[in-house]
Amino acid sequence: MLRVTKAILHVFDFETGTKYFSQSTLDLEDRQTKSYVQRRLRKITANPESRHGEFAPTSNFAGGLQEYAHGDVEFVEFSHQIAQWFWEELRRADDVEQCDLLVADYIDTDAGQALVSAAADDEDAQAEAFEGEGRRLFAIVLLPRKQAFIHDVNGSANEILRQDATLPSPTQKVDSYAVIDLDTGAIDFHDHDRSVAGEGKFIIPELFLECSSEASSHEVIGEVTVIVQDLAEEYGLEPAVEVSRAKAAVAEAAEVEEVVDPIKVGKRIFEERPEIQEKYEAQVASRELPEEVPVKRGVANRIAKNHKIRTDTGIEISFPSNLTDRPGYLEFSHESDGRITISIKNVAHIENR
């Protein structure tokens, strides 16, 4: 659950060369405003495609953020500084994009909820979890404005009008944002390449935050499954089985700690084949995957809880990833002619979907 304490929206109009910086925060008592901001922040906070980073010692923004967190700078003033920086940088891009800038200070109470789940039998731990404030986060989001059309009926007038200031829907993905944990300094961000004077730049991590860039949860899980599939094919194992086991290991690790260690996943899958495990670890190192990557339970469920396969005959099967580790439910066997037989067993009921 998110609790937004402050939020503000600034407008950039690159066509006219005009910027409109708000002088007051958004009214979060207004139901629609609060709903939009919360849903937008929830979308980016839980995005598995967010890359992770840490501030460089020379980061200018890190110092300013620390001053704000300590109360030395007011929220509106700090948001103006951020907006001015983005205004100057974005207008230098070869292809300018109309956008608004959302800045927010909010609390993510999911950490407290996780503590409650992990200590369900410990009354003191539960009390601590509910009393805790969760993670205090600071978000900077570029909201692309899109052209839309509205129907206007006014007396004898009946027109279709163009609206150039339409914000993206709360559930729509946005390409450019940063979320910083004000307690730990940990950064989640997403950005796309922009051409500035003919040179490609990721302005959020490289120029604004000045931070490192580690693979996202989605990227790490994808790399792990690719490595497992390649090794399964190389050593004559069934790729569908081994990849589903890898996904099950990811889901299980996220359920317990909300962190996935690629090396531990390999040890879990190839514990009886040390020669494959050694190759797996070498490939993890060569691809420079992080030792650990944060993966929330909900994200793991979406990405790894189920595994889907499709045969060359057009049959598609989706099944729980952990089913291949449970004998007597789903079996893959190779025939002498190279064909594969898939057996689904112990089924008591079939439902059309």
List each language-model region with its residue ranges:
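Long, hydrophobic alpha/beta structural blocks
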Residues: 1-301, 305
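C-terminal structured domains
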Residues: 264-353
